[in-house]
Amino acid sequence: GIHGIPVTMQQSVYDALAGGALSNYWTFGRDSRDASYYNRVVVGALRAVDFICSLPQYNGKALGVTGSSQGGALSVITAALDSRVTFLAAVHPALCDHEAFFKKRACGWPHYFYYYGAPDEKQLETVRYYDTANFARLLNVPGWFSWGYNDEVCPPTSMYAAYNVISSPKELHPYLETGHYWYQEQWDEWLDWIRRQLNVPM
């Protein structure tokens, strides 16, 4: 996970962290792009690419990133920042179009300004630096995207704000009635596309 914590502990450990030390972690360090919690998270994603590229199993050709929600955002960000990534697949990506709030539109998770009030200039600069839509402009690899129109966590308008600025090859597969979850056929379609990018037999 993004917190650098083993994923094999008892659920009670994660529940305690979510309600305690990691509560509202997305607000940590939001006065500075360098102190932001997401700085370490993004660097960690790039280090993961370093690790994959160091493995003898890696063919040096195809390397994809994929995820949903926060993981979808990190997929876009990682693909935008690291030229070794050759494709991405993002499902209901978060962290999109933070400033939509000021234009009376729905912004994506974590809805900074709904819950935490109007930002000062430093906070505004920081959230711009970690806005998926701003990284989407930098993409130059194929991307597969999917989301639902009933998603209240990552509203579709926020995700369209990122999708619409992508100039590289892209596919959007909306599942209109879904919220912040997947249908099985959506999962199957996502996996088939990834297999094609990797030239893996279906």
Regions found by a protein language model. Give the residues of each.
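Hydrolase active-site cap/lid region
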Residues: 72-120, 174, 182-185
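C-terminal catalytic histidine-bearing segment of alpha/beta-hydrolase fold enzymes
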Residues: 160-202
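Cap/lid segment of the alpha/beta-hydrolase catalytic domain
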Residues: 1-43, 100-107
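Short alpha-helix in the alpha/beta-hydrolase fold that links the catalytic acid
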Residues: 141, 155-164
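Active-site nucleophile elbow and catalytic-triad environment of alpha/beta-hydrolase enzymes
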Residues: 120-135
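Short beta-strand/loop motif that positions the catalytic acidic residue
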Residues: 138-139, 145-147, 151
